[in-house]
């Protein structure tokens, strides 16, 4: 419920620096929360079976199993680019999760871009 309230606050004509900072911080933290939740979800899928797997990290890795930073990297790359980079997906469940994450990220990033353009246009017009 905080994000719609923050977006509504950005749309008002008389907004101060505190309100603008609050709305911007809320949007940034909600963006990060989405990708952190997907990172935890991918970690759960990776370690759910008797033998961990489902993601193939680059061959230069020195550790045997992925840690949370690996999943954060994987998730935030999807969140920023709506695609995977150097991590191979070898499990159907994780592939479906990554597909949903990519679609949600694309929609979210498009909405944020539109919002920022609207804010910039209204600031220039004022």
What is the predicted function of each stretch?
Residues 44-91:
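Membrane-proximal soluble regions of multi-pass membrane proteins
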Residues 31, 36-48, 55-57, 71, ...:
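Broad hydrophobic/π-residue packing in well-ordered secondary structure
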Residues 70, 74-77, 89-125:
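Pore domain of cation channels
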Residues 13, 17, 79-87, 100:
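General secondary-structure edge motif
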Residues 1-39:
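Long, highly hydrophobic alpha-helical transmembrane signal-anchor segments
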């Amino acid at each position: 419920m905080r994000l719609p309230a923050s977006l509504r606050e950005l749309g008002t004509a008389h907004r101060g620096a505190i309100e603008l900072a609050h709305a911007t911080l809320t949007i940034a933290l909600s963006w990060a929360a989405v990708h952190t939740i997907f990172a935890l979800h991918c970690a759960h899928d990776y370690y759910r079976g008797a033998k961990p797997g489902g993601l193939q990290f680059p061959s230069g890795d020195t550790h045997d199993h992925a840690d949370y930073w690996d999943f954060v990297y994987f998730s935030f790359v999807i969140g920023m680019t709506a695609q995977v980079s150097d991590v191979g997906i070898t499990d159907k469940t994780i592939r479906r999760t990554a597909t949903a994450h990519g679609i949600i990220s694309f929609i979210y990033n498009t909405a944020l871009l539109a919002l920022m353009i609207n804010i910039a246009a209204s600031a220039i017009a004022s």
